[in-house]
Amino acid sequence: MAMLSEKNNVSDVMFQRLARNNVKKNMRHYLIYFITLLFSVSMLYTFNSIGAQFSMLNMSDRGSYLAFSSGMMASVSVFISLILGFLVVYANKFLMRRRKKELGIYITLGMRQKDISRLLVKETVIIGGLSLIWGILLGIFLSQGLSLITIKFLQIEGAQYRFVISPLAVVECLVFYSLIFFFMNWRNKKMLAKHSLVELLYADKKNEEAPDEKLAGKFFMLTASVICMAASSVISVIDGFNMKYISVSVVVLFIGTFLFFRSVAGILLFLLHKKKRLYYKDLNMFSIHQVSSKINSTNKVLSVICLLLFLSFTTISVGLGISVSVSKGLSKMTSADAVIESYRENSGQEISVKDKLEQLGFPLEKLTSSTVEVDLYEQSDISISSFFLPGTPGKEKLLKDRYKNMDQPLYVMKISAFNDLRRQQGLEPINMDGQEFLINCDVSEISKAYEYYAEHGEAPIEINGHSLSLMKNGVYQMPYQNVNVLSDMGTLIVPDEAAEGLESFRSLLNCMYTENSEQMEEAFMDAWQELNDTGLRIATKRLIITEITSTSMTLSYIAVYLGIIFLICACAVLALQQTANAIDNTARYETLRRLGAKESSMRKTLRTQILVYFGVPLVLGLLYSVVGIRVMYTELGNVPADVIAQNVLFASVMFILVYGSYFFITYNNTKNILKLDRD
């Protein structure tokens, strides 16, 4: 037994040493796999640490909005983990395909499949463990940067940066790695059991085959591809951000991209062949045929990669803009620290909200420095459509898509109540005579229609028997309630006497705390929770801000998260394809070397091939992104040009770092494979 134990220990030491040596020897193969796993783990940590990052914002989570956002991000991470899992498995499959001959040699030397599987497990533990550790460290660093960017862009009051580490995110990364580890080992065992010794030994002799088509057909496909690309751009902007047209646009774009890659290589080969001086210069003939052959054989993959790059750059560029757009509109969504609302038709009460609270024993005077109660009335015969004149810009679009119920009656508010709200918000009251009215609207598209009416409408309107004309510059966008969506499509501000006799169906009590602090918010809400069956509804400023901020920030994170993952997927596939191509071309480069080709010329040839293979999908993807970014930011609306520029710059930096890293790693990797690192 002692001898057997000693033999097993020696075997373990031998396998450990062999695994380390194999990792070192195959580092040029493992490098892309290592970088892909490292980036994957770092992204998982960065975006799963969102719960810890929320703690920097110093926002109350009474409504559990931050917890919901963390859960939403965790759900998205499950989907992302599946994508990354398949990507890592794809990289591992490529690695095993390139090592089949080596594994076949192990079998000829008498090593059992069980021992080979054991060896592969140890290799995976070494390379996976290193990428896991470095990935988590990189994720911790990136999460701090993401926190700083979030605080800067959202400009949340009280937000303060501090260094945080999320133990939960670390655990999630470990779970992801463990699942990938077991799945890869299962795949490796299945691969070894499936292939015979002959298949393993001669696996490196198999190459991809490219379709052969006539030149006229290629010119036709290229023309069709250009038409599809142009049509896609036109379709995407036909009707603003209409998902039906956007979906059609993406499908047409993919078809155009596929036709482009299916045809362009053969056409360029034909055209360059006519340029004899260029074609026969140095190793250009070899380079041109290599690039043409590779693009022809991988046109479907390149089409998908091109769209991934387009989606990646667009989502990263627009992602942070979502939060900025929403944060810019926060001031329009809240009018006071707390707004208590009553629907008279529901509660059946005739007393005011303030009197109702006093009856219930709510300490309103103690908790607030000022209160303003306003009644909203309804004029049944005046609706939004009453102000839509012929020629109103965007009228058809508004009626068709977004605001189909244009016959909805408008709210009516007394000018005295409106001025009380303005004073509470630190604004000057408005002087208006008895024959005028104002319109308050916070929906920008509808507000533009009212402004057009102010310029071109002359006929007065009839309100409760009073003939009123719109006051000059009488369109306002002042909030008078706390809401999570801008929904005031028009409130008529009329002289007090014009509202006399109208039935009040809704009352709002705008409250300002005695001090603007988290403690006062907690005290107010604790007192509110003690009330039972009030028939009233409450919306606090901090609760609304927390809800909107957490939702918009989560959407921004998801957009950037997906964008970076798409980028990693595209880069990894490109890198693996080129590495596989280099291994397949080892004999061809040896032939060039025997024919007297210079090492510098062969390096230039290799660099050109990789540059074209990486560059063409990137250029196309960025061109597509120009249209995509324009459409998205047009829909988002109030995002300043300098913020858009910053977001695009951020996306560009991400592309330079990730895309550039994969490019240089691929070039150095293939250069070592082809032994072109010698002078």
Locations of regions flagged by a protein language model:
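N-terminal Sec/SRP start-transfer signal
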Residues: 1-41, 208-224, 228, 262-309, ...
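Membrane-embedded alpha-helical segments of integral membrane proteins
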Residues: 230, 234, 241-278
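Small-residue-rich transmembrane alpha-helices
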Residues: 42-53, 90-94, 127-156, 169-194, ...
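Peri-transmembrane interface segments
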Residues: 24, 28-35, 46-80, 94-97, ...
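Transmembrane helix boundary and interhelical loop/hinge segments in multi-pass membrane proteins
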Residues: 88-104, 194, 283-284, 577-591
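Basic-flanked hydrophobic alpha-helices used for secretion and membrane insertion
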Residues: 64, 329-568
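Selective transmembrane-helix segments that form parts of the transport pathway or gating/packing helices
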Residues: 27, 33, 120-138, 174, ...
